[in-house]
Amino acid sequence: VRVNDASSDFWSADCRALADARGLKGVVLAKTEGGNHMWDTSNRLGGETPVIALIETARGLSRVHDIAAARPCFRIAFGVNDYTLDIGVDQDPLALAYSRSQLVVASRAAHIPGPIDGPTRDPAELPEAVSLTRRMGMTGKLALRSSDADTINTGLSPSDEDVSWAQDFVDRFNSQGGKPKDGSDLPRLNRARIILERARMLGLITP
């Protein structure tokens, strides 16, 4: 459920309405601009509800590491439409590359799942947009239409070849005592573990 931003007049009412909602799995907090927004929202909802931080402003991006590190933060999402209006740029991949990278780095540093990219308005542009999302290291994408789901899920899921390589590499590494043989082993091990983590999250392999 989307919750209005913590500085708005509607935030308190939103939280009150959801505090005792049965079956609530989590909320998306609009225009998150600090870790305190995460804590305040979580506490209003009882302290256990996962919160997805929607980054929609320059201030939010500048504090994204603090936001990601806040315990209630389940994940970060990129509110690309409002964000580009706030900083005054077009939705150009090059113009937004730094911003997307910051979300990826903050998520990884905080040990939370990879960030969720913003939606794509034109269905014809969705496949290329999903490809960009994946290349930037983001692991999810907001959808405007239910018909977007298959394209997004397919485009962001590890391929069978990637999963097979990752499993083989980890098995071989462990069978050799779990010690790197050279400097290239650790980066490849980290990549393999990320692939397997995503595959498990998506139900492609069993835990």
Question: Where in the sequence are the language-model features?
Answer:
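Expand to "…catalyze enediolate/carbanion chemistry for C-C bond making/breaking, isomerization
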Residues: 1-207
